[in-house]
C-alpha cells in the first residue's frame, strides 16, 4: 500500500512504529497532488513548503531529535508550530488533512470558491482549526467547493472544476466536492467538509468515502463562513468509520464563541466503536425514503442489499414513518436561502474581498461588487431569500416553513423512540455527468434524502455500500441517529462497514 492510500489510523500506527516519517507521509501526499490534482482538481491551493516544515517539526518532536533549523524558519501558517504545546501522542499528530475552502486558517486563503473573496487571506483560525492544531495536525491545502457551499455538484465553484476520481466525466457531488474527491482520489489522508443540507454525505456517497454530519451544535461554527446558520455543521470526510471517529473527537466540543455548543463532555468515539456489531440494533425503515419514484435502480439495489446484510448480521428491521418528509425540500429552500441572504449581505466590496473598479458612488459600489463577485447560483439563492423575508411574505413563507420544520423534527423524535437508527439511501443517483442537471430544481433533488435530518438537527453518516454494476460508480447508504447520538451513529456505521 502506498503512503498516500493510508487513513488516519493506519498512518499514525506507521508513524508510531517508525515505518515512515511525517515528512515522508506529507511528501507522498504532495507527490500525489502533483500527479493527480491537474485532472481531478480537488485542491485550490497547497502550501507545500509550510506542510513540509510542520512535518519536519512533528518528526523532531516525536523522536526528540535536535532541531535542524532555526525556529524562525519553522513557523509557517500564521505562527503555527509543532515544537511546543502540542500532544505528540494524538492520533492526528503529524497527519496532513485537507480543508474545505470556507474554514478559516490563519495565514491561508479563504475564498469560499468565490470570485468575491479571491485573494482574501484569513487573519484568524476557526475553532475547529484551533482544536486540530492542539492535536498537531498538518494543514494539507484548501479544497474546492460549490461557491459559498451552495450546490450539490461543485459545478458552482467560481475558481475551478473538480472531477470525480472514479470517473472524470462525472461530478464529485457537493458542496464538499473537493473534500470528497481528495479523500476518494487519495490526495489526502482525510478532509474537513461542511454539511448544510447534505454537503458532506452526498459527495461522500459519490466518491466512496465516509462522511459524518454531526448533530447541530456538536461542532463549533466559529470561523466557518456562514451559509445557513441554523443548519451549517463541520464534519469529517475519511477513508474509514474509525478515522471519522478519531477526527470528530478532535473537532467536537464546547466553544464560548458558538452558543449552540453544549458543555457536555465529548465521548471517545474511536473507543466506543470497538467491537461494533449489528446484533440487536433496531434499524428503522421509512417508506418515505425507500419508496420514492425517481430513485436510480442501482441505488435501490445496493440499498436493499445493505438492509439485507444488516438483517443477516443480527439487526432487527422496524418499519417507521416520517410523514412530513414530503415538505422538507420546500422548507429547506425557504429557510436556507433566507439565512444566506442575511449572511452574505456582509460581502459588499467595502471591507474585504472584491471591490468593483467601475463604481462611481457607494450604491453602485455595493451593486457592482456583488454582481461581479457572486456566481449565478449564489445570486439565485440571495434573491429567493430576500423575497421570503420581505414585508408581506415573511409570515406566508418563512414563518410557516419554521413551523413545518418543527413537525419534521418531531417525526424524527417519534421514530427514535422505536429504533436506534434509520437506514436510507444517501442520494437518489450515483455521480452524474457534468451538465446533466442544468435545471436548478433537478439539482436540488440530489439532497432529497439528506435535507430532512439537517432540518431536524440530528446526526447522520454516509458509508460506502458498493458499486453500480454497469459504470462501477460508488454508492453510499445513510444512517441517521438522534441528536447528540454520534456514539450510536458511529457504532452502527462501523458495524455496517465491517459486513458490507
Stretches with model-predicted labels:
Residues 18, 94, 134, 188, ...:
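Glycine-rich, small-residue loops and helix-cap segments
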Residues 29, 51, 100, 132, ...:
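Conserved hydrophobic/aromatic pocket- or pore-lining residues that grip, position, or stack substrates
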Residues 1-52, 313, 387:
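An N-terminal boundary/leader segment
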Residues 60-90:
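Intrinsic disorder/low-complexity segments
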Residues 41, 258-266, 281-282, 286-289, ...:
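Flexible, acidic loop-helix segments that line cofactor/substrate-binding pockets
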Residues 92-234, 286-288, 338, 424-441:
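Short glycine/serine-rich loop/turn segments
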Residues 31, 35, 185-190, 194-293, ...:
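Structural helix-boundary/capping segments
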Residues 51-56, 136-137:
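Long amphipathic alpha-helix in the N-terminal Rossmann-like dinucleotide-binding domain
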Amino acid at each position: 500500500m502506498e503512503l498516500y492510500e493510508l487513513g488516519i489510523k493506519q498512518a499514525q500506527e506507521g508513524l508510531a512504529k517508525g515505518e515512515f516519517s511525517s515528512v515522508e507521509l506529507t511528501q507522498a501526499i504532495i507527490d500525489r497532488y502533483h500527479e493527480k490534482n491537474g485532472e481531478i482538481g480537488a485542491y485550490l491551493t497547497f502550501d507545500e513548503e509550510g506542510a513540509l516544515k510542520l512535518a519536519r517539526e512533528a518528526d523532531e518532536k516525536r523522536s526528540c531529535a535536535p532541531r535542524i533549523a532555526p525556529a524562525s524558519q519553522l513557523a509557517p501558517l500564521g505562527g503555527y508550530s509543532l515544537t511546543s504545546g502540542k500532544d505528540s501522542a494524538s492520533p492526528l499528530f503529524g497527519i496532513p488533512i485537507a480543508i474545505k475552502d470556507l474554514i478559516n486558517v490563519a495565514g491561508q486563503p479563504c475564498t469560499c470558491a468565490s470570485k468575491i473573496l479571491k485573494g482574501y487571506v484569513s487573519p484568524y483560525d476557526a475553532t475547529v482549526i484551533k482544536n486540530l492544531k492542539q492535536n498537531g495536525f498538518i494543514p494539507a491545502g484548501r479544497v474546492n467547493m460549490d461557491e459559498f457551499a451552495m450546490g450539490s455538484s461543485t459545478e458552482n465553484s467560481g475558481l475551478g472544476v473538480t472531477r470525480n476520481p472514479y470517473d472524470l466525466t462525472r461530478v464529485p457531488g457537493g458542496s464538499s466536492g473537493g473534500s470528497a474527491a481528495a479523500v476518494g482520489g487519495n490526495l489526502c489522508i482525510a478532509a474537513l467538509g461542511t454539511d448544510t443540507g447534505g454537503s458532506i454525505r452526498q459527495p461522500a456517497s459519490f466518491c466512496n468515502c465516509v462522511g459524518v454530519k454531526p448533530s447541530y451544535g456538536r461542532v463549533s461554527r466559529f470561523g466557518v463562513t456562514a451559509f445557513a446558520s441554523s443548519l451549517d455543521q463541520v464534519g469529517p470526510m475519511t477513508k474509514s468509520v474509525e478515522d471519522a471517529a478519531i477526527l470528530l473527537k478532535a473537532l467536537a466540543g464546547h466553544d464560548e464563541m458558538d452558543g449552540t455548543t453544549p458543555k457536555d463532555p465529548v465521548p471517545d468515539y474511536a473507543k466506543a466503536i470497538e467491537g461494533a456489531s449489528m446484533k440487536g440494533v433496531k434499524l428503522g425503515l421509512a417508506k418515505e425514503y425507500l419508496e420514492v419514484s425517481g430513485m436510480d435502480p442501482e441505488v435501490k439495489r445496493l440499498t436493499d442489499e445493505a438492509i439485507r446484510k444488516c438483517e443477516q448480521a443480527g439487526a432487527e428491521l422496524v418499519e417507521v414513518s416520517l410523514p412530513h418528509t414530503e415538505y422538507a425540500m420546500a422548507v429547506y429552500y425557504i429557510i436556507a436561502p433566507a439565512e444566506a441572504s442575511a449572511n452574505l449581505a456582509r460581502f459588499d466590496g467595502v471591507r474585504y474581498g472584491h471591490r468593483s473598479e467601475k463604481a462611481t458612488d457607494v450604491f453602485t459600489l455595493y451593486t457592482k461588487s456583488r454582481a461581479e463577485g457572486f456566481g449565478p447560483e449564489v445570486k439565485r439563492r440571495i434573491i429567493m431569500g430576500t423575497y421570503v423575508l420581505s414585508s408581506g411574505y415573511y409570515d406566508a413563507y418563512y414563518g410557516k416553513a419554521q413551523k413545518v420544520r418543527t413537525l419534521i423534527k418531531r417525526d424524527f423524535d417519534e421514530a427514535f423512540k422505536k429504533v436506534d437508527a434509520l437506514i436510507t439511501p444517501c442520494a437518489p443517483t450515483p455521480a452524474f455527468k457534468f451538465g446533466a442537471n442544468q435545471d436548478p430544481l433537478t439539482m436540488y433533488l440530489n439532497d432529497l434524502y439528506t435535507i430532512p435530518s439537517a432540518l431536524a438537527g440530528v446526526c447522520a453518516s454516509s458509508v460506502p455500500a458498493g458499486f453500480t454494476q454497469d459504470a462501477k460508480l460508488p454508492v453510499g447508504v445513510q444512517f441517521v441517529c438522534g441528536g447528540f447520538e454520534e456514539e450510536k451513529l458511529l457504532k452502527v456505521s462501523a458495524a455496517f462497514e465491517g459486513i458490507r
